[in-house]
């Protein structure tokens, strides 16, 4: 067979594959378009302009770039409030700020998606390293069942114990399972809230942003956290992370990032915020 025939065969294979998957591609485009509309509305409603891209130094009081970026993320993620900062070095750091901000000695943290990331495991259960365990915070976990949230075991647990915080990991991480869908999460939260209405719901949202039409905040998450190096940064944010959710919980996390007296009121960034704004603007399509 000559080269032209090979080219023709290859072209036919590609065309057939694209035709077979056309509905899937259309669904992906629809999700991207819907999320892009959210981002555009957030930029418009917060009157984002070139002045928000400028860098600052010193304490960062009244840093309009930082404060407006927080508002944009809150709107895009359907949250009351958001903390977005280049000083958050990773997703694990963002999650750690939220955990240490919310939890107190003798509180119980329950993971309903089994083991957490290795880097977060030492945050929760490390010995002598300033972990949650060192501060008297208890940790329990319920393993997934065939890659799905084990609602029956969760119900049994909650009938006996009322944890302060219930933790979901949305992505598969390093395990061989599918990522949790928003429907999976929403169904689980509905069940949990009927049994333990006072338990707070936290979601590790890393790799989950813009993959569906809405975020976990719409389906009952009290607080979510993620990295700007992944989806939400659109491939342009050079560093950073975010925390979003109920205003009082986000502020508790902000007090761990800075100080209990200043919270989210401070934090400068000399290099400026253009890449962060441009990253979130492009993220729906990039993801």
Q: Residue ranges of each PLM-predicted region?
A:
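Generic structural marker for isolated residues within well-ordered, non-membrane alpha-helices
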Residues: 70
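Conserved PLP-enzyme active-site core in the AAT-like
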Residues: 3-24, 29-30, 38-45, 49-52, ...
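N-terminal pre-P-loop "Q-motif" helix
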Residues: 66
């Amino acid at each position: 067979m000559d080269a032209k025939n090979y080219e023709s065969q290859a072209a036919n294979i590609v065309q057939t594959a694209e035709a077979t998957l056309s509905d899937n591609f259309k669904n992906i485009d629809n999700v991207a378009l819907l999320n892009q509309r959210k981002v555009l509305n957030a930029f418009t409603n917060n009157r984002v302009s070139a002045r928000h891209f400028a860098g600052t130094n010193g304490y960062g009081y009244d840093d309009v770039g930082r404060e407006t970026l927080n508002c944009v993320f809150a709107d895009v993620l359907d949250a009351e409030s958001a903390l977005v900062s280049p000083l958050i070095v990773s997703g694990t750091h963002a999650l750690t700020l939220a955990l240490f901000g919310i939890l107190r000695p003798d509180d119980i943290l329950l993971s309903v998606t089994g083991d957490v990331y290795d880097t977060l495991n030492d945050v929760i259960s490390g010995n002598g390293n300033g972990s949650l365990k060192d501060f008297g915070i208890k940790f329990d976990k319920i393993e997934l069942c065939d890659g799905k949230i084990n609602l029956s075991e969760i119900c049994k647990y909650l009938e006996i114990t009322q944890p302060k915080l219930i933790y979901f990991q949305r992505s598969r991480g390093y395990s061989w399972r599918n990522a949790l869908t928003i429907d999976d999460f929403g169904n689980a939260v509905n069940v949990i809230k009927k049994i333990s209405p006072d338990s707070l719901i936290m979601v590790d949202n890393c790799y989950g942003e813009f993959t569906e039409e809405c975020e976990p905040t719409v389906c009952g998450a009290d607080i979510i956290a993620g990295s700007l190096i992944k989806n939400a940064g659109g491939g342009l944010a050079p560093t950073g992370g975010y925390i979003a959710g109920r205003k009082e919980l986000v502020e508790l996390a902000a007090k761990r990032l800075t100080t209990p007296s200043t919270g989210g009121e401070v934090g400068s960034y000399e290099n400026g915020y253009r890449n962060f704004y441009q990253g979130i603007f492009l993220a729906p399509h990039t993801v």
